[in-house]
């Protein structure tokens, strides 16, 4: 940022989950500081330090946070189109196809329109598209559709409607809450974008 010469800027950021994604966020903040010659620093906050995962968009929009990293599917309840910009269920576009659609097929314009309809006031940077979600991890074997009826299952986005129609009890939880929810019995099974 050549326009920042002689001044230092610190931006507060909050990623939406722990594990490998937090490690990638730490690497990103380090690269930004190095590339700006130390003039731009990102104060990376751990999960829950400022707001809950489900509140990141509102926190950035209101100015409580300068930036945040989260999955648009987490605001599926505000507008179902939000799920088009994250990982889909275990069918659909590959990561490369999603990026192609975003950049060359009208996806970015639809994203901006959806963002406006939801009422968020920020600029989104689309990155790290994940492949289609695996069906998940289960406490018991699933060998036929009847096995999932009544099962408490964690997912987000478009899969919510599909799996509810199959008879599952869907809970939309952030990634960082999956493991505790499995241990306490809040859910019987879960999907997450990859096995990290």
Regions found by a protein language model. Name each.
Residues 26-33, 61, 66, 71-152, ...:
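Contiguous mixed-secondary-structure segments that line small-molecule binding/active-site clefts
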Residues 7, 37-38, 149-152, 167, ...:
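Alpha-helical hinge/cap motifs
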Residues 14-25, 49-53, 104, 152, ...:
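Solvent-exposed, acidic/flexible segments
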Residues 31-65:
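Gly/lys/ser-thr-rich phosphate-binding loops in alpha/beta enzymes
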Residues 1-11:
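Single conserved hydrophobic/aromatic residue that forms the stacking wall/gate
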Residues 18-43, 161:
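Short, polar/charged alpha-helical segment
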């Amino acid at each position: 940022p050549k326009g920042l010469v002689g001044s230092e800027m610190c931006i507060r950021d909050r990623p939406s989950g722990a594990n490998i994604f937090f490690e990638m966020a730490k690497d990103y903040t380090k690269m930004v500081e190095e590339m700006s010659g130390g003039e731009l620093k990102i104060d990376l906050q751990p999960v829950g330090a400022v707001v809950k995962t489900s509140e990141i968009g509102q926190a950035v929009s209101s100015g409580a946070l300068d930036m945040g990293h989260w999955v648009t599917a987490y605001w599926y309840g505000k507008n179902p189109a939000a799920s088009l910009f994250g990982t889909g269920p275990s069918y659909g576009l590959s990561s490369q196809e999603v990026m192609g659609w975003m950049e060359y097929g009208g996806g970015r314009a639809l994203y901006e329109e959806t963002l406006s309809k939801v009422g968020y006031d920020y600029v989104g940077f689309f990155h790290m598209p994940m492949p289609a979600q695996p069906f998940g991890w289960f406490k018991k074997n699933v060998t036929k559709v009847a096995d999932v009826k009544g099962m408490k299952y964690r997912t987000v986005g478009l899969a919510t409607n599909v799996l509810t129609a199959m008879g599952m009890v869907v809970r939309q939880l952030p990634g960082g809450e999956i493991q505790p929810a499995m241990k306490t019995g809040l859910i019987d099974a879960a999907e997450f974008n990859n096995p990290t």
